[in-house]
């Protein structure tokens, strides 16, 4: 599933499911209580691969957004103006918008962070099916480095603080 605690509370989680189609359909009603999107992706295990794909995109994206704004700050750009501009072009994303408070106001909400575990699972799963995972491997290494230097990450937005401070 994707959407975190807020999505669960609001009933807007995205469920990425795998397994027998009949069993999936039998579970649909209870899943609809907490989900706005429920997708059957294939056989048993397919939901986990879908979740790992989501986490891969989020992990890499968070670092890219953080680096972009760290560079902009150091170059003296008005990051409010940059943010407003990026949300009107092809760089716009839900993730960029979700990071607004960290990027513009140095607010880093404490959230459950499973990033390193999830990134490791994505690398391992890719390798298990014969897929090279160079970007994900580097991303995992960066998160591990940030985690070690920061004395632990209390939330996924903490990587932004680290990038701003280095």
What does each model-found stretch correspond to?
Residues 46-163:
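Helical "substrate-binding/catalytic lid" subdomain
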Residues 1-59:
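Rossmann-fold dinucleotide-binding core
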């Amino acid at each position: 599933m994707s959407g975190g605690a807020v999505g669960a509370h609001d009933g807007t989680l995205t469920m990425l499911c795998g397994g027998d189609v009949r069993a999936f359909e039998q579970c649909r009603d209870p899943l609809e209580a907490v989900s706005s999107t429920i997708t059957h992706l294939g056989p048993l295990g397919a939901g986990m691969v879908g979740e790992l794909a989501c986490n891969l995109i989020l992990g890499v994206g968070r670092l890219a957004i953080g680096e972009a704004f760290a560079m902009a700050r150091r170059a003296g750009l008005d990051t409010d103006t940059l943010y407003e501009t990026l949300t009107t072009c092809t760089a716009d994303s839900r993730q960029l918008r979700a990071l607004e408070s960290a990027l513009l106001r140095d607010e880093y909400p404490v959230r459950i962070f499973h990033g390193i575990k999830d990134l490791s699972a994505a690398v391992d799963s890719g390798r298990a099916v014969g897929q090279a995972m160079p970007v994900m491997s580097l991303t995992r290494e960066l998160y591990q480095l940030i985690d070690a230097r920061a004395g632990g990450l209390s939330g996924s937005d903490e990587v932004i603080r680290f990038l701003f401070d280095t």
